[in-house]
A protein has these predicted regions:
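Walker A/P-loop-proximal flanking segment of P-loop NTPase domains
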Residues: 1-47, 51-64
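Short, amphipathic alpha-helical interaction segments positioned at domain boundaries
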Residues: 391-422
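Domain-level recognition of nuclease-like catalytic cores that cleave nucleotide substrates
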Residues: 103-128, 530-567
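Helix-loop-helix "sensor" segment of P-loop NTPases
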Residues: 216-267
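Conserved catalytic cores of phosphodiester-cleaving nucleases, focusing on short active-site segments
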Residues: 445, 471, 480-511, 515-520, ...
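Winged-helix-like regulatory helical subdomains adjacent to P-loop NTPase cores
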Residues: 271, 275-360
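P-loop NTPase nucleotide-binding core
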Residues: 37-38, 44-47, 51-167, 176-182, ...
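Sensor-1/coupling segment of RecA-like P-loop NTPase cores
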Residues: 160-162, 166-169, 175-221
């Protein structure tokens, strides 16, 4: 079954995610000690959430298969979304993983005789539990609420009967909300919480692709699951991990892979694993079939063909994301109009600007923007402008609605012109979003190596000795209240140092309020705050920084610093 859900190719190209794997391992180890730590993983589609879950499952089966902790995995979109069908298939997946025979197909556990026969060999109390569920199913009008309650409690009954612990992994967890459409259920999350709270030997690890929806489920105080899960974001790779993945993908072409090729792939993909995969595969095709050189220009051509070509993997993922997202939005005409307008504005637009451009009332446009934010297509930024969450999707939408679609391989002249145009637009989008700078700053932090530099580059008088950071990541607190662009930490236990870094790449001076927010977030992490602003700072902000031991840098400072450390 593992090879069926986690193909050998995916296993071979798995890269890093060691922090997330360690967190999953910690949850498992704590469960063994009777402490339950539920986890929720959020991230864009195809960013790697499912792969890291399967890699955790694979490693567990290899090293702890006979231990006291049993792992189960199910992809909720594959389950029937009627209460009766869901309950039967939910229990079927659990039986498949818990019965210990992974050589059968999971579908063989979906019928009543198989479930009753299998559970009959797993202890009397557990068998009685499964029998009770099927007795309820035999009724003319089954109690749907009871069926789900019995299904959700199945792993706990097994754990109590067998003296085991169970981790239940639920991929694409928000799909469960479809059960709210049944009057007897009404609020499936409340039911799920009630069962979860009564359990003691089961831990849940869930994942979902709609960041906004995942945040509402796990961080909104009105949600039944508020504070029950630690929400972790799975983001794109940093430069080092992106390079490692590219080396694996392109090993058939060159070893080592040229540095300019590594840099070009990171530049166009921003480290998104699926975009890396798609671009690398097109590079292999273009070199193998069209005799292209292994160079940065070939990477840019590959990315352009993948993004604008109707057979491109990135093109089809973007189209899928758009179509799936708009299915959840009432009436597609106005949402599409808003998306088209926003696609042309890398810096984003305010509500008033969008309403004026479309000649519609602000109230109606606000409602559309709320819908689009709910399905993760757009976001409202700190400066109150709206824009796309994903610069690649923004670029694709701009070309898609303009009618440009490549149905074959264009001539070299046409392709070269398209590449130049697309790269210029893409860089403009990424730079306006600050995404390019965020990744560059992380690279910069990783290049710190004890160098001593002029303190004026950080807004202070005395020289600054740059720490040697062991780990550089973005940070989102479990309750969603504290978010920092980058947190960098040293590994020296005696002289441990941690920096909290915020980047604002907008066309205005950064003010005192923005610095106050970073200072508070840095204090919560016991970190030194470093604020980077493209345009610099107001006088009030400079005074605040001086009195609060903050480091400040402008675009010019950052450029000098990058040259000094060699990035």
């Amino acid at each position: 079954m593992l090879d069926y859900i986690y193909p050998e190719e995916e296993q071979r190209f798995f890269t890093n995610r060691e922090y997330t794997l360690a967190l999953l391992g910690l949850s498992r180890d704590l469960l063994g000690q009777g402490v339950r730590k539920h986890l929720a993983l959020s991230g864009f589609r195809r960013v790697g959430k499912t792969v890291v879950l399967k890699e955790f499952l694979r490693r567990h089966l290899e090293t702890n298969r006979g231990g006291d902790c049993r792992l189960t995995y199910m992809d909720l979109p594959r389950l029937a979304l009627t209460p009766e069908g869901f309950a039967v298939q939910y229990v079927g997946y659990l039986l498949y993983w818990l019965a210990g025979d992974l050589h059968q197909r999971v579908e063989s556990f979906f019928d009543a005789p198989a479930q009753l026969a299998t559970s009959g060999q797993m202890g009397a109390a557990f068998s009685e539990h499964v029998v009770r569920l099927h007795q309820e199913l035999q009724k003319e009008k089954p109690d749907q609420h009871l069926l789900l309650e019995l299904a959700f409690n199945t792993p706990e009954v097994y754990a109590q009967t067998a003296g085991k612990r169970v981790i239940v992994i639920l991929d694409e967890f928000p799909e469960i909300l479809a059960l709210d459409n049944y009057p007897q259920i009404h609020d499936v999350l409340a039911l799920f919480r009630a069962v979860l709270q009564a359990q003691s030997r089961v831990v849940y690890v869930v994942a979902g692709s709609m960041n906004g929806l995942m945040e509402r489920i796990f961080l909104d105080a009105a949600s039944p699951l508020f504070v029950h899960f630690q929400l972790e974001t799975i983001g794109p790779f940093g430069r080092e991990d992106c390079d490692a993945l590219v080396r694996k993908r392109l090993s058939m072409l060159a070893d080592p892979v040229p540095g300019d090729v590594l840099a070009a792939i990171y530049q166009v993909t921003r480290g998104h694993p699926f975009y890396v995969y798609a671009t690398a595969m097109r590079v292999i095709e273009n070199i193998s079939l069209l005799n292209k050189p292994l160079a940065s220009a070939t990477v840019q051509e590959a990315f352009t063909l993948e993004t604008l070509g109707s057979t491109g993997r990135i093109y089809n993922l973007c189209r899928y994301v758009l179509e799936q997202s708009l299915q959840g939005v009432r009436g597609e005409t106005m949402p599409q109009a808003v998306l088209q307008v926003l696609a042309q504005q890398p810096a984003g637009m305010t509500l008033t600007e969008i309403a004026a451009r479309l000649k519609r009332p602000s109230g109606a446009i606000r409602q559309v923007l709320t819908w689009l934010a709910d399905v993760d297509l757009v976001e409202q930024r700190e400066d109150k402008t709206y824009g796309y969450r994903d610069p690649v999707l923004q670029l694709w939408v701009a070309y898609y609605y303009s009618g440009l679609q490549l149905t074959g391989i264009p001539s070299q002249k046409v392709l070269s012109n398209l590449v130049a145009e697309l790269m210029e637009k893409y860089e403009r989008v990424a730079n306006e979003l600050g995404l390019a700078k965020e990744s560059q700053v992380r690279e910069l932090l990783e290049a710190f190596n004890g160098q001593e530099v002029d303190g004026r580059l950080f807004g202070v008088d005395s020289p600054v000795k740059l720490p040697v950071f062991e780990r550089v990541t973005s940070y989102l607190s479990p309750d969603g209240q504290v978010q920092v662009d980058s947190v960098a930490e040293t590994s020296d236990a005696e002289n441990h140092e941690r920096w909290a870094v915020e980047i604002k790449w907008r066309g205005r001076l950064s003010g005192k309020k923005e610095l106050e927010k970073l200072a508070a977030n840095a204090r919560s992490r016991s970190a030194k705050p470093w604020f980077i602003s493209k345009m610099g700072f107001t006088q009030e902000a400079l005074e605040f920084a001086r009195h609060n031991d903050m480091l400040l840098s402008s675009q010019a400072d950052l450029e000098v610093l990058a040259k000094l450390v060699g990035t």
